[in-house]
Every structure is written in C-alpha cells, then in structure tokens.
C-alpha cells in the first residue's frame, strides 16, 4: 500500500522529508504547499542542498508543480491551510512543516481541504506526540492530528527507554549540543524573547532552552517529571549530540549499559537506534537515518548508579526519516493492518 502525502511548508524539514519520502516504498509525495516560494525556485532548492548534497534523482518544474523522477507533484501557494485543496491530488496524510500551525486547532485546518490526518513535524502544545520505537503502538485511528515531537526528543526517548526498561531511570539531566538552525542569526540581531539567541550562530556557543527532555515524559509516562534539559547551540550546520546524565534504580556497570544498548539496537529498536564503538565526530553522522546513534566509547560512569550517556543524531535527516516512518505506520493502523 502506497500512502499519498502532502507537505505544507517547503523549508528545511519539508525538503528533507521530501528527499526521504522518495526513498520510502510506502510513501508518495503528491502535493506541496508554500506561499513564499515559486515553483521553479522550489525545484532548485530541492535539487541542491549545501548540507546533504545534490538530489540523486531528476527534478524538473512545470507551471503547476514539480516532476520528480517522472512523477508529478502538484505545487500550491495558499497562505491559509484551510484553502489548500489536498483532495485534488488524493493527499490523505499531510505533513505540517511550516513551524507555524503546531496546535491541534491550527493544524486541523488541513482537514477542510480533504486531508484525513495531519502530522506536525514539530513539538505540539496539545496534539498527541509519537516517537517511533517508543510509543507509536499507542496510536489509535480516531486521532486526526498528531505530532512527531522534536528531533532531540526522538534521540533522547529511545535512549531513556532502554535505561528505564533495563535498570530503572530515577532522574536525569540532558544537554543537547545542537547545530544551529534557521531561527538563529547570521550576524548579531534583535531577539526580544531570547537575547542570547540573537547572537551570531557561526561565532558562538549559545545556551538555550529546550522542552525536549520534558517531552519524553509525554511519550513515556513513567518518566514524567524525571527528566529536564537544556541546549547548547554550536557553530556546526548539521548533526547534534545528546548528553544524558542520569541516576539508575538498579546497580549497573557501564559495560552492562553498553550491552543493553547494543541488544536494543539489534532488536526492538532496530532502524531507530544504532550502536557504535567507533571514534565518531559529528560530520560522520551527516545523513544517518537513525533517531539515535549510541556512542559506546564516549560515555562514562561515576559509580554503579550514576552514568553519562552520549548519543548522536542527524537533526535534519534522521528526524525527517521518522516523519515518513510514522506516516507509513499510522496508515497501516488506519487500514486495519
């Protein structure tokens, strides 16, 4: 079964989701909406990417859309999500990737145009959040609007799950060392809500807030209130790393932690988590499709209850792959599979 999908917002995540969808046998992008981009410019931005390189397929543009590897993708330029005629192309599932319509009420506007389900590619204040490999099995077909959470939550949640399932996670603090993103500045500029966030991205390490750790409590209810964290935005263009320092209920050695991560990555979290004992640096993970790459040689233990774990993630590519995986999964559930 091939699921027909539309994308609203052809920015960073929208385009990387598109690239991932081309590689996925169960998903077909049939329509894109972005009021700020002309069709020929959309083709250019899909074809060329400074971080992930040139698109491997064939991209052309026509008056009303894109032709990608011989398949036509309709292109709309509606500002109001309620006016996008998704039904014209049969787009049953819509990815909301503008970063603007992130509540259930706002994202539900897509349903008026014929979409059956809306997947928000960002955290949401009220829409149910799902992390593949962690809580996706709790999805029910009556849910119309859902969130794929954040890239950091998608990395942290599998990591925390393995610790909690095997050794009990009492409490933890997370720091994500995160590549800069489009919301940051190329030169110092005004940022009234976050003064530090207005400083030059390529010249500074910038402390920032993040709700990614607390969000783990929403996808793993038993960890609610046990995790919090912060972000350090750093001058790299892509790939980030989670540092989770936590206290375990059971006595554990670091070798036992490694073994649990290795086992999970080969079994229940296969395709979601990977395990590495290589001496990795961030650029080695560019384009990695996993949510969480456990770095076995980077972590340390203070004692048998207090450990520091390190896991990498491509905050663009890995996250976008999960958006597509989530759609394929919920479409299967909706079809009664």
From Swiss-Prot:
The record marks 178 as: Activates thiol group during catalysis. InterPro entries: GlycerAld/Erythrose_P_DH (IPR020831), GlycerAld_3-P_DH_AS (IPR020830), GlycerAld_3-P_DH_cat (IPR020829), GlycerAld_3-P_DH_NAD(P)-bd (IPR020828), Glyceraldehyde-3-P_DH_1 (IPR006424), NAD(P)-bd_dom_sf (IPR036291). Disulfide bonds: none annotated. Keywords: Cytoplasm, Glycolysis, NAD, Oxidoreductase. Pathway: Carbohydrate degradation; glycolysis; pyruvate from D-glyceraldehyde 3-phosphate: step 1/5. It is an enzyme of class 1 (oxidoreductase). One of its GO terms (molecular function) is NADP binding. It comes from the Eukaryota. PROSITE patterns: GAPDH. Homotetramer. This is Glyceraldehyde-3-phosphate dehydrogenase. The lineage of its organism: Eukaryota, Fungi, Dikarya, Ascomycota, Pezizomycotina.
């Amino acid at each position: 079964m091939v699921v027909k999908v539309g994308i609203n917002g052809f920015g960073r995540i929208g385009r990387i989701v598109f690239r991932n969808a081309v590689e996925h046998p169960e998903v077909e992008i049939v329509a894109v909406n972005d009021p700020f981009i002309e069709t020929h410019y959309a083709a250019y931005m899909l074809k060329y990417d400074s971080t992930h390189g040139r698109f491997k397929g064939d991209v052309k543009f026509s008056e009303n859309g894109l032709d990608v590897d011989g398949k036509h993708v309709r292109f709309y330029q509606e500002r109001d999500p309620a006016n996008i005629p998704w039904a014209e192309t049969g787009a049953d599932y819509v990815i909301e990737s503008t970063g603007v319509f992130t509540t259930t009420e706002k994202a539900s506007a897509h349903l008026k145009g014929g979409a059956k389900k809306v997947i928000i590619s960002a955290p949401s204040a009220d829409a149910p959040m799902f992390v593949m490999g962690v809580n996706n099995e709790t999805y029910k077909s009556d849910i119309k609007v859902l969130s794929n959470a954040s890239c950091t939550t998608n990395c942290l949640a599998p990591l925390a799950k393995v610790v909690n399932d095997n050794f009990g996670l009492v409490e933890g603090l997370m720091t994500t060392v995160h590549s800069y993103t489009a919301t940051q500045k190329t030169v110092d500029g005004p940022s009234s809500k976050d003064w530090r966030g207005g400083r030059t991205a390529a010249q500074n390490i910038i402390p920032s807030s993040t709700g990614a750790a607390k969000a783990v409590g929403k996808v793993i209810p038993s960890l609610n209130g046990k995790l919090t964290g912060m972000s350090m935005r750093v001058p790299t263009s892509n790939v980030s790393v989670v540092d989770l320092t936590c206290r375990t209920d059971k006595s554990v050695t670091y070798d036992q932690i490694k073994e649990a991560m290795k086992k999970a990555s080969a079994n229940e979290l296969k395709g979601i988590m990977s395990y590495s004992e290589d001496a990795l640096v961030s650029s080695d993970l560019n384009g990695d499709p996993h949510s969480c790459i456990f770095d076995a040689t980077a972590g340390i233990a203070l004692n048998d209850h207090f450990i520091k774990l390190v896991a990498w993630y491509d905050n663009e590519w890995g996250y976008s792959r999960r958006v597509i995986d989530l759609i394929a999964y919920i479409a299967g559930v909706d079809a009664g599979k």
